[in-house]
Swiss-Prot record:
The keyword tRNA-binding does not apply. This is NADH-quinone oxidoreductase subunit I. Belongs to the complex I 23 kDa subunit family. Keywords: 4Fe-4S, Cell inner membrane, Cell membrane, Iron, Iron-sulfur, Membrane, Metal-binding, NAD, Quinone, Repeat, Translocase, Ubiquinone.
């Protein structure tokens, strides 16, 4: 048999109507209530101190790493798709909303035929962008994607960067992309120091040749 313990032995349950009214007044009229009213009136009477904006006429500027609707990136130099069809984004998706269909081309390399995301089911956790080895899928800043239907699918042509807009594609854009200082966080290998020594010797030889002339 379970043992039950009283949390507050001094607390008495109100019986009469007056006891119930007095208990309600004691709980509602406290110092914290007046503190909240004071803060509200102080912010209300301040000039040019609006805590809201007139949406959709005004919009808040979002950070580049904000997780909104996905984007599929291209290589700027070759205009090819970055996606290699490894399927890691589909496997790691905890909402099970990513579907990918791949096939082999004439060179025996895998290519993505169909790619779809159920945006109505996606929770925008960013796992797909974090796990992508080629930085092919990132999160953009397009957040106005409300729809009337529950299942709202986006397809490959919706996410992929158009070739005519490729010049506007920024490398470090969207959640999942590398940071601008990513190279500073990579551990140096022995080959790195060998290359730096060779460059230093080349610069030294160039300076000596310039002085001899």
């Amino acid at each position: 048999m379970k043992n039950y313990y009283l949390v507050d032995e001094k607390r008495k349950t109100p019986v009469s109507t007056w006891e119930k009214i007095s208990q309600a007044l004691r709980r509602s009229v406290k110092l914290e209530l007046f503190v909240g009213l004071f803060v509200m009136m102080r912010e209300l009477l301040k000039r040019n101190n609006s805590a809201t904006i007139k949406y959709p006429f005004e919009k808040v500027k979002l950070d580049n790493r904000y997780r909104a609707v996905h984007r599929l990136m291209r290589f700027i130099e070759s205009e090819n798709e970055r996606c290699i069809g490894c399927g890691l984004c589909e496997k790691i998706c905890i909402s099970n909303c990513i579907r990918m269909e791949t096939s082999l081309d004439e060179n025996g390399r895998k290519k993505v035929e169909n790619y779809s995301i159920n945006l109505g089911r996606c929770i925008y956790c960013g796992f797909c962008a974090e796990v992508c080895p080629e930085l092919a899928i990132v999160h953009g800043t397009e957040y106005e994607n409300a729809a009337e239907q529950r299942s709202y699918f986006g397809y490959k042509q919706d996410f992929l960067t158009p070739i005519d807009k490729l010049k506007n594609q920024v490398e470090f854009e969207g959640a999942g992309s590398l940071r601008k200082d990513a190279n500073l966080w990579v551990k140096k290998t022995p080959n790195y120091y060998d290359v730096m020594i060779e460059r230093a010797l080349e610069n030294q030889n160039t300076q000596e040749q310039g002085e001899n002339k």
